[in-house]
Amino acid sequence: MNNIPKSLNVGGQTININIKDRIESDKLGECCVAEARIDIAKTFNGREQAYPSQLNTFYHELTHCILDTMGENELSGNEKFVSCFSSFLCEAMNTLKYD
């Protein structure tokens, strides 16, 4: 999947994906399951976030969203795990081959 979707379902809840010019505290992205949203920043520290980085950020925030929905708050708070897992997921999804 090379495109960031507008929405998806996680645990029976529709999660809306918003591309924003900037996110407070200069984050690349953030998710809030309670508000059913994932936000991805176009800019970070005053610089444009390249599309491949936005896509990786989408998978990073999706990983948080899934773990939070599962009640795995400690694992979701482990940024090393989330970053590593989401990078592998992003790579796998973007290199899918079909016959």
Regions found by a protein language model. Give the residues of each.
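Short pre-active-site segment immediately N-terminal to the catalytic Zn-binding motif
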Residues: 34-57, 72
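Active-site recognition of the HExxH zinc-binding catalytic motif
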Residues: 56-68
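Catalytic zinc-binding patch centered on the HExxH motif and its immediate surroundings
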Residues: 1-9, 16-39, 48
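Short active-site-adjacent helix-start/loop capping segments
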Residues: 48, 65-66, 75
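Residue-level recognition of conserved beta-strand positions in structured domain cores
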Residues: 19, 42, 67-69
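Generic recognition of cysteine residues
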Residues: 31-32, 65, 84, 90
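Post-HExxH zinc-binding segment in Zn-dependent metallohydrolases
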Residues: 72-99
